Amino acid sequence: METKKTFKSFSCETNVVWKSARRGVVRAAAKPDIEVSSPPEFKGEAGIWTPEDMFVSAVNACTLMTFMAVAMQRGLEVVSYECRAEGLLEYLGGKYRFTEVRLYPQVVVKSQADVERVKNILESAHANCFISNSISSAVTLTPEVRVVAGI
């Protein structure tokens, strides 16, 4: 007898409060506030998170969380994971939009036998990250997988 899998819907709620000029605060229940500003290129303050930073970070963090969920499910032992991300913001058709988010994950494992598994799991994470699946920007992955010596 086949068991039918059911899927839930989820809701995410945030609140933004304007503070001054091009600066505000993002709030969510039971989480620390995040100060935000326009980027300096758009007359905002340097050194403060921007919506652009958060957009690219959302894709990056979702890919991490999806990768780790699949890795744990498949019994892959990950020594470390770090990923640099770049978002390409372009002026097209009279407006700015992110056309691409590039991810450069660096994953370290204990065994050479796990290198291909990591690449397969990264592809699965890439295909199933719900943030990436919700945006029109292309998301590319350029992974580097290393085996740690001496463990």
Question: Which functions belong to the PLM regions below?
Answer:
Residues M1-S57, M68-I151:
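Extended beta-strand/beta-hairpin segments
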Residues C62-T63:
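Alpha-helical metal-binding/catalytic segments enriched in His/Glu/Asp
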